[in-house]
Amino acid sequence: VPATIRHLYFHIPFCPKLCPYCSFYVEVGGEHKTTAFLDALLAEVDHMRQRFELRPHTIYFGGGTPSALRIEQLDYLLSGLRARLDLSELREWDLEANPATIRQDKAKLLHALGITRLSLGVQSWDDDLLKVLGRVHNAAQAEQTVEILRDAGFTNLNIDLMFAVPGQTPTQWESTIAKTIALRP
């Protein structure tokens, strides 16, 4: 009997921009590589299915910025995985997202395809600190993204925050925590 794999992590290395603090493997842009990458990822899943029973409890898409994939790419990837994996015991399907890459149509598709939790890389609710971090979104856009995700049906959101950003004051951190709690992710 083959071993059963219960937890899967897929690294989607594509990003709209390299943030100065990032130490992960990323490809900025990379549009010309995306299709080949997704084909290779699904081929790897096919290969793994020959050796293991893939019946995950959790699936996590990290990066990079998985939400930077275009709608048709996300549909291809998620539909391809749904066709290849036994999801009967799936408890959580998480995807990391940058607020600048989520619009209503993408949020609705992600929810419809079974993503149960979005991990939103807000990092801060302070525009000055977001500039220090080199983020491509601002605080208002991040807050709007939370609303878009709620409207799409997401009830489980994770909001990533960064502490000890250069120049960050205790007051800014307290404000960030208060804002996050008020949004009830």
Regions found by a protein language model. Name each.
Residues 1-9, 52-55:
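N-terminal [4Fe-4S]-dependent radical SAM core
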Residues 26-51, 55-185:
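Conserved non-cysteine loop/helix-boundary elements of the Radical SAM core domain that shape
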Residues 9-11, 119:
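Structured core elements
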Residues 11-24:
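Local cysteine-cluster metal-coordination motifs and their immediate loop/turn environment
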Residues 4, 17-20, 89-91, 155:
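Residue-level signal for beta-strand positions within conserved beta-sheet cores that form or flank
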Residues 3, 8, 18-19, 31, ...:
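Generic detection of intrinsically disordered/low-complexity segments and helix-coil linkers/edges
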